[in-house]
């Protein structure tokens, strides 16, 4: 099953930027961008400075890059 693309990858591709373009424009390392896009590193746990720089380079809001967090509610045993 192919995993869906990260919001970061979708935003970057929408602007037809390469990962290298984004690294250069944001000042965030190419390796970090690759890891966020491949979900080897969680962008939600990245520094605000990094996410803000990436968002600025992609002309979007920080919230547009964060991945949804699934909340699991505890069910009480009946």
Label every model-predicted segment.
Residues 1-16:
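A short, Lys/Arg-rich alpha-helix, primarily the initiator
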Residues 8, 22-23, 33-36, 65:
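Conserved hydrophobic/aromatic packing and binding residues within compact polymer-binding modules
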Residues 13, 24, 56:
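Alpha-helical residues within the helix-turn-helix
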Residues 18, 29-32, 47, 61:
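Short coil turns linking two alpha-helices in DNA-binding domains
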Residues 28-44:
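Recognition helix of helix-turn-helix/homeodomain-like DNA-binding domains
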Residues 40-56:
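Short, basic-rich loop-to-helix N-cap that marks the start of a DNA-contacting helix
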Residues 56, 63-78:
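Short, charged recognition helix plus adjacent turn
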């Amino acid at each position: 099953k192919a995993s869906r693309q990260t919001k970061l990858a979708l935003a970057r591709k929408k602007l037809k930027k390469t990962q290298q373009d984004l690294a250069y424009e944001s000042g965030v390392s190419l390796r970090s961008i690759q890891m966020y896009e491949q979900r080897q590193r969680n962008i939600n746990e990245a520094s605000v400075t990094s996410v803000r720089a990436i968002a600025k380079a992609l002309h979007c809001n920080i919230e547009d890059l964060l991945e949804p967090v699934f909340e699991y509610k505890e069910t009480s045993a009946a």
